[in-house]
Amino acid sequence: MLTIKRYPGAIEFTVHTSKSYGTQMFALCFISFVIGATSLAIGRSPKIIITLVELSFLLSLFHIISGVNHESLFVIRDLGVQTNCHSIVPWKSSSKLIPLDSIRDIFINEGFRKFDVCYYMGIAIESETEIHVVFPTLLPRHDVLQKVYKETVILLANNS
């Protein structure tokens, strides 16, 4: 889901994850916890079941904590762009400011991710050999990227 906020001389694009994803992971985590607590209360469960339930609980919890909540691109005329990746936990969040004079090119390209073709928006930076990918974790659909690309290029081209 794309959210656009407009400011004088700036625009912010935010891509959110599906809200049901976190709910599903919480349900899985809660169910595995209940099964584990019940088997401990009964006291006659085999140790392998308890170990598997604990393992599934910990994996579910790790998946929830390491997930990305939303990613954003903040475009400021005469200054540059800032990319943000917001995680559920604050210490996993990151941001990068790219000054306008170091932006060589902004583009949309297609790439492969596992066995799927996906589109990504990239920023070529003057002093770096690697491309900075915008929305690297969530990888929104092509039509969303086109909308972000058009408005970003228009705003950055209107330098005054």
Swiss-Prot record:
GO BP annotations, alphabetical order: GPI anchor biosynthetic process
Major localisation: endoplasmic reticulum
Chain ranges passing through the membrane: 22-42, 48-68
Membrane topology, record value: Multi-pass membrane protein
Pathway named in the protein's UniProt entry: Glycolipid biosynthesis; glycosylphosphatidylinositol-anchor biosynthesis
Pfam families (UniProt xref): PIG-H
Alphabetical UniProt keywords: Endoplasmic reticulum, Glycosyltransferase, GPI-anchor biosynthesis, Membrane, Transferase, Transmembrane, Transmembrane helix
UniProt keyword annotation of Transferase present: yes
Catalytic activity: a 1,2-diacyl-sn-glycero-3-phospho-(1D-myo-inositol) + UDP-N-acetyl-alpha-D-glucosamine = a 6-(N-acetyl-alpha-D-glucosaminyl)-1-(1,2-diacyl-sn-glycero-3-phospho)-1D-myo-inositol + UDP + H(+)
GO CC annotations on file: endoplasmic reticulum; glycosylphosphatidylinositol-N-acetylglucosaminyltransferase (GPI-GnT) complex
EC numbers: 2.4.1.198
GO molecular function list: phosphatidylinositol N-acetylglucosaminyltransferase activity
Presence of keyword Transmembrane helix: yes
Compartments where located: Endoplasmic reticulum membrane
Family assignment from sequence similarity: Belongs to the PIGH family.
Biological role stated in the UniProt entry: Part of the complex catalyzing the transfer of N-acetylglucosamine from UDP-N-acetylglucosamine to phosphatidylinositol, the first step of GPI biosynthesis.
Official protein name in the record: Phosphatidylinositol N-acetylglucosaminyltransferase subunit gpi15
Lineage, highest ranks first: Eukaryota, Fungi, Dikarya, Ascomycota, Taphrinomycotina
